[in-house]
Amino acid sequence: MMSVDATASPVPALLATDLYRFYHAGDDETLALRGVSLAVEAGETVAVIGPSGSGKSTLLACLAGLDEPDGGMVHVAGVPMSRQSEAERARVRARNVGVLFQSANLVEHLSVRANVIASQQLARKVDRARVDTLLDRLGIADRAGARPSELSGGETARAGLAVALANEPALLLADEPTGELDSATAARVVERLKAEADRGAAVVLVTHNAELAAIADRVVELHDGAIVQ
C-alpha cells in the first residue's frame, strides 16, 4: 500500500508555470508574456499591477482559460487548464473559476437571477437558495427579475459579481473590478472580494487602483510581460 505523506504541502489553488504568449500581426511578433510563473494559495489575495500593455489582461485571460499560452502550464485546484480542448477548459472554468470583468458579461434576454442560475447550470450544480442569498448580500435581491438593460451601472457590476461567484469558485479573477464604480458600489464589491478570500478562494486582482491593491496579501508587478517584483 502506498503511504501518504501527511506533511506534504497542499496544491496551490492557482499554479501558473513559465507562461509565454506570442501575438502575430503580419510579419510582426509581440511577446505578451515572458516566462511568467505565479502560485496563489487558497485564501490568498494577489494584486497584479503594471502599466498599460504590460501583459496584465493577457495573463488574466490565460489564467481563466479564455486564452491559451504558447508555452507553460496553468493548473487550477490541481486540474490542468492549459493544453486542453476548448470544451475541457470551459468545463474547468465553469466548476473552479469565477471571472469578474470590468464590463459585466450578462445575457440580455435573461433576468439577473436567471443569469446567475445559468452560470451554475454550466457547472451542473444549481443551488437556487445560494443564488437568492448571493443577490441579497450584494444588495440586488429586489432586482432579481430585471433584465441587464434595466439595471444601473452599480447594479450591473453587482450582477456580474454574482455570476462570477455563483459556483463558489476555487479561483476568482477580477479585472479592474472597481474601475468605473461609485464609491458605495466599489466598497460593496471590495467587501465581497474579501469575503471570498475568507471563504478560502484564491483571488487575483488586475488593477491600476492603489487602494484596491492595498487589500491584497501580495502585489506582483508586470513589465513588458515579465514579473519584476
Predicted features along the sequence, with ranges:
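Short coil-to-helix segment of the ABC ATPase nucleotide-binding domain corresponding to the Q-loop/switch region
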Residues: L110-A118
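Conserved ABC transporter NBD signature motif
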Residues: G72-P80
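Helix-to-loop junction immediately C-terminal to a conserved catalytic motif
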Residues: A64
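Catalytic Walker B motif of ABC-type/P-loop ATPase nucleotide-binding domains
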Residues: L172-D175
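Conserved ABC ATPase signature
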Residues: R147-L151, E155
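Conserved signature/switch motifs of ABC ATPase nucleotide-binding domains
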Residues: A94, A146, N167, R199
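ABC ATPase NBD coupling module
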Residues: D27-T30, M81-G98, D198
